[in-house]
């Protein structure tokens, strides 16, 4: 049964809630260090810092509270936004980054590394709630949890019978308990919040899937911009970011030698491609599992062996899930793995690996080695090493993607926020940013890498039918 008494009350007198404000100086220094590596964001501050297109608008962020995100927050603040922020993962916050932003006054921050699920959803609701009890004008979302809370809140207000049910999923029950408390205090609150929201910009593949589902069902409550499918996000953050941060997470957690090992990568989308390249670069033999024949063919033609998880478990030393799907690695798979195989996930949510099996099956026991590194003894008598409790390994066990590649993503996020703020004609649909802006984001990052572009002549541009200054490719071009 859903129970409002289980939910912690909001405390709107709190300016921030972070782990340790004494870490602020360290955070400020890291932010200064990253400025040179975020040229896109710095250029947007120069371009829009005077006109301040976000002036007077309230922005809620639900996105990993890292140093890179601190630079995004700084950019939104310089463009005039009034900001409240929570992380989108219980392990991804860098506490010095959260402290630095709280200390700067650029945003109200509710995030710390190692939150419980109850903490997490309390933080999300705190980020969605201003001191007067009202909500945001704009959302910056990663994984769709802020969007989910608003939509579920409206659904509950329209059908309070939902609060009389009990839910098997622990996290969803926590959400419903929070919504029960909100409904008890103000049964029309979430409808007012939704009515105020001008739109959301969504960072990641999983969150975008949620948005398209809402649109297809006619349930999307406000306009949305799909930042993930901007080329300068998905083909850079997802691929090149994961190529570096996956290995960082695995090595910090385990100190394992990757060379010579067999690494199984589940999923060969942009994230999986980056993971496979990373592990091959360290000298591993990489196996890929895929459901999509196109992605499977790509993997095979890059020289990877494409097989099923049922076969791969017999060989794998390290397993990485990168699918955005559910129960990709099951209890049966884990029971068949080698002793002390390493199992981790780089997809957004924690259900790609069946953690529920480990946590509820008699005979499975957990020994914590260090934060975010657990040795699970299985019914088989063998053990596996699970990283970050099945959540994002690169952020749970390391610091996520490097600043430069995140500058690509966050420049897109900022441009999306400007579009949502300034375009009153957007409908309740999912949009993508135009190709011209995608190319602009790339241009802003070329000088840092010493790149000099060739310029088309007018004759050449006319010959291929494009403007001299772009865009150079049609919308359907794959890159």
Swiss-Prot record:
EC number: 3.13.2.1
Residues that hold substrate according to the record: 66, 142, 203, 233, 237
GO CC list: cytosol
Record pathway: Amino-acid biosynthesis; L-homocysteine biosynthesis; L-homocysteine from S-adenosyl-L-homocysteine: step 1/1
Binding site for NAD(+): 204-206, 238, 267-272, 290, 325, 346-348, 394
GO terms (BP aspect): L-homocysteine biosynthetic process; one-carbon metabolic process; S-adenosylmethionine cycle
Record carries keyword Hydrolase: yes
GO MF term list: adenosylhomocysteinase activity
Subcellular location: Cytoplasm
Keywords: Cytoplasm, Hydrolase, NAD, One-carbon metabolism
InterPro entries: Adenosylhomocyst_ase-like_sf, Adenosylhomocysteinase-like, Ado_hCys_hydrolase_NAD-bd, NAD(P)-bd_dom_sf, S-Ado-L-homoCys_hydrolase_CS
Residue spans crossing the bilayer: none
Cofactor: NAD(+)
Cofactor binding note from Swiss-Prot or TrEMBL: Binds 1 NAD(+) per subunit.
PROSITE patterns documented for this protein: ADOHCYASE_1, ADOHCYASE_2
Origin: domain of life: Bacteria
Database matches in PANTHER family: ADENOSYLHOMOCYSTEINASE (PTHR23420:SF0)
Protein function: May play a key role in the regulation of the intracellular concentration of adenosylhomocysteine.
Sequence similarity: Belongs to the adenosylhomocysteinase family.
Protein name (Swiss-Prot/TrEMBL): Adenosylhomocysteinase
Gene symbol of the encoding locus: ahcY
